[in-house]
Regions:
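Fe(II)/2-oxoglutarate
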Residues: 1-11, 332, 344-345, 349-376
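Hydrophobic beta-strand signal
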Residues: 16, 261-262, 284
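A short hydrophobic beta-strand segment most commonly corresponding to one strand
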Residues: 277-292
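Long, charged, low-complexity terminal extensions
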Residues: 311-346, 352, 375-376
């Protein structure tokens, strides 16, 4: 791929990757998911009166998509767009880890599943947590042009959920993303993004320190759109200069098997109304680097997987979840590399001579934590 294309992805903070899975394979995954839901009436979903997002994490469809070789390659590619300004940073982009999330089947006409412009990864934490704040230090120093959104150095150990928020994420996700299982275009219940990553982030970080009307310095305790225990929200009143009415851009038309990814700081929203004729269905699959905190997260998530229980970031964590469900995934049939990315299986990760000091260190730690019998 040309460097100019890679630079554009880094600049915009988002990408559509075509044909990650064959079209028919993606459609088969949707059909399988629908069958799994129908076979298990106890599945929880919201909104409860017209389900759109299903509280499923270990269905055969989700597990197969996460473990697919093309999906692992896609995550590795997305991770490779990142770097650390410190070679000692304990992060591996060679071996991304798998974060289990939910699935969405949004029906035509739906207007209930509407998420306004927001950014995940906490809100006040960006200023409050000392390590997280260092991510944006160049912006706070008045040198926003020098800020590098793809530098993971201070994100690795940042605390992005200081308030145990119900929608918080305990893992460091380089990119959020989903795999399309539908033919869906703009206005058809899909995603909108603000493709001005560096500019929008600089505005967000500096916004609490000036009056939006006069532009004068404002050092009171207000942080517009930031509420403890919630993600960062945006609207024309709190962040008027973002001009959200025009700066939020719909994701291009996608087909089953296409993958959409957006940077962890990207402002995103969902169409208020699904104006299409077919369902807008996706499997949420982010790209996560191997870092010490993420390894510890995977260790806990692995326990949830084997118990068919919701992972620690989601409602009902530790509860019965999908225990006893008809058609539950058989872990013995999941490919080895896919299992390993979930901290399962029996083989650890290999080191290579060209890896940085930090990458070697985190791989050794991951093997000790997740595969102690192999690393011993």
């Amino acid at each position: 791929m040309k460097d100019s294309v890679l630079d554009e992805v880094r600049h915009r903070g988002s990408a559509v990757i075509r044909d990650v899975l064959p079209r028919q394979s993606a459609l088969d995954l949707k059909k399988q998911a629908q069958g799994y839901i129908a076979a298990n009436p106890g599945v929880k979903a919201f909104p409860p009166d017209d389900p759109t997002v299903y509280e499923l994490y270990w269905s055969p469809s989700q597990t197969a998509a996460r473990a697919h070789p093309n999906m692992l390659l896609t995550q590795r590619f997305l991770a490779s767009l990142w770097h650390s300004s410190d070679s000692r940073s304990e992060m591996s982009t060679t071996y991304p880890l798998t974060y289990a999330d939910r699935l969405r089947i949004r029906r035509p006409g739906d207007g209930k599943f509407a998420l306004g412009p927001h950014t995940d990864g906490g809100s006040l934490e960006r200023w409050e947590d000392p390590e997280y704040a260092k991510v944006y230090q160049r912006i706070l120093d008045g040198e926003w042009e020098e800020y590098d959104p793809m530098d993971a150095r201070h994100r690795i150990n940042a605390r992005m959920d200081l308030y145990d928020s119900p929608g918080g994420c305990s893992a460091f996700r380089l990119f959020q993303g989903w795999l399309s299982m539908s033919s869906t275009g703009p206005g058809e219940g899909t995603l909108q993004l603000c493709p001005l990553l560096k500019h929008a982030t600089a505005y967000l970080i500096l916004r609490p320190f000036f009056d939006s009307t006069s532009g004068s310095l404002n050092l009171d305790s207000s942080f517009p759109g930031s509420v403890p225990g919630a993600g960062q929200e945006y609207n024309p009143e709190t962040h008027p200069h973002l001009e959200l009415e025009s700066s939020m851009v719909s994701v291009p038309h996608v087909e089953p098997g296409d993958f959409v990814a957006w940077h962890c700081d990207t402002i995103h929203s969902v169409d208020k109304q699904h104006m299409g004729r077919g369902d807008a269905s996706v499997l949420y699959i982010p790209a996560c680097a191997m870092t010490p905190p993420n390894v510890e997260f995977i260790k806990q998530q692995r326990m949830a997987a084997l118990a068919y229980s919701p992972p620690q970031d989601f409602p009902g964590a530790g509860g019965p979840g999908e225990v006893g469900f008809h058609g539950a995934v058989d872990w013995g049939k999941v490919p080895g590399d896919g299992l390993r990315a979930m901290g399962l299986g029996s083989s650890g990760w290999e080191k290579s001579p060209n890896m940085s000091e930090g990458e070697v260190s985190v791989i050794e730690k991951a093997n000790r934590v997740l595969f102690p019998s192999v690393s011993a």
